[in-house]
Each structure stands twice: as structure tokens, then as C-alpha cells.
Amino acid sequence: EGYEDMRSLYARALRETVAGEPARQGIGQDGDPGYSTAGVVADTLAAQISSLGEYGNAMQFIAAAGLLARSRNLFALGSRAAYPVSSHFVHVMSFLAGADRKVTLVGEMAGQGLDALQHAGRGDVLLAVGMSPYERTTIDVARQSARQGVGVVAITDSSVSPLTRIARETIIVTSNSQSFFRSMAPAFAAVEILAALTAVQSETNAAERVKQSEEQLAAFGIYWKPPR
């Protein structure tokens, strides 16, 4: 096999690591200074995130970004570990929204609660983020939103996830890690890829929007300045 074949096999092995598996089987408690836990974990994350750019995954991103770009208003929902991912989506997408479109974080942990979705309907889009074990609230809210005509985009970890069956477009990411916890790094990367593609499809000058926003925040004294 050629180098690229071997590289592909190695990357796949890293991506498919089971959550909770020790950083390197066969390495004792003292570890191996030549093959550190930090290096193995970093390699795994790099392979998982890199796989998001493969053709099949890229097509999923493009389809989902098209739905986001055409949306009237955007909402994001995620519980527990998925909450920071949905919050990051709202923060990034708010730069693209402009004055004519709202981007709202909803859910039990969000200031808006679920009330913001009461009047959501056709033309609106909800990003629902959920990994196994799936939160009942996320599933129920996504299902009800779809019934109201809201387009649901899911970021989840399996093609048989309950969110996949509800969503109009789905981004599959892995949450496996080389340690004891589920990794959300690929989900964060997915949000940023979606934002970049949505900016392109919206034909929005995102850099100018960010500049304007930061200038406004600076005028309100949001940013720290060193003492003179």
C-alpha cells in the first residue's frame, strides 16, 4: 500500500477510538516519554477534525449551510456538554445576521428559555446539538420545532441518532476521545465550518460585519485596555 493509503488507515483508526480507552494501550502508568499522552490525544483530535473535510462530510456541510443561508431567523439548542457548542454557534453566526435576522440561543440553560421558539415557523432554522446519551429535552424541542415548519439542522454523533431522524440536514461528528470523556472538539469545528460556508453562500462580508461589531463593543468599553 502507498503512503496515502497507510495515512488514511491510521487516521481512521484514530477517529474510531472508543471513548474512555486509555491514551495508549500497552503503555504503563509511568508512560512513554517518546509517545506522550498529549501527543496521542492531539493526533486523535487532528484526525477527527480533518475528516470533516472529506468529500461526503463536505457535502453535508454545504447542504446544511445552504439551509442556514436562506433562513429567516436562527435558533440554537444544546444541553449539558452540547450547550457550549450551540452557544458558540450563536456567537459566531450573530456576526452574519445583521439587523434583519435574529440568532437566538434557546433551552433550559439559556436566558431565552424555550419561549423564543413559540412563534418560530417556516423559514426559520434550528441548530440542534446532541451526543449520546441524548438529552430528552433536545429531542423533544427539535421534534416540535420540525412540526411547526422549522428547518432543523443537527450536529450529532451517529446516523441512527434520534436527531438524525428529525433533522432536514445532519452533520455527523465523532465524540470519541483517547481519554475518559466525550470530546466536543469536532462539534466545535463543525460549527465553525458551517459558519464559514454560510458566510460564502450568504454573500455576506463577514469580515466587515465583525469589524463593525467589535468597534461598537469597544465604544461601550467592553474590551480591557492596559493602564496608561
Regions found by a protein language model. Give the residues of each.
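Internal, active-site/partner-interface "lid" segment
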Residues: 201-228
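Glycine-rich phosphate-binding loops that contact phosphosugars or nucleotide phosphates
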Residues: 70-202
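Generic alpha-helical secondary structure signal
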Residues: 4, 36-43, 47, 58-62, ...
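HTH-adjacent hinge/linker in prokaryotic transcriptional regulators
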Residues: 1-59
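Conserved active-site and cofactor/substrate-binding residues in soluble primary-metabolism enzymes
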Residues: 40, 44, 56-59, 63, ...
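A short, amphipathic alpha-helical segment
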Residues: 11, 15, 195-199, 203, ...
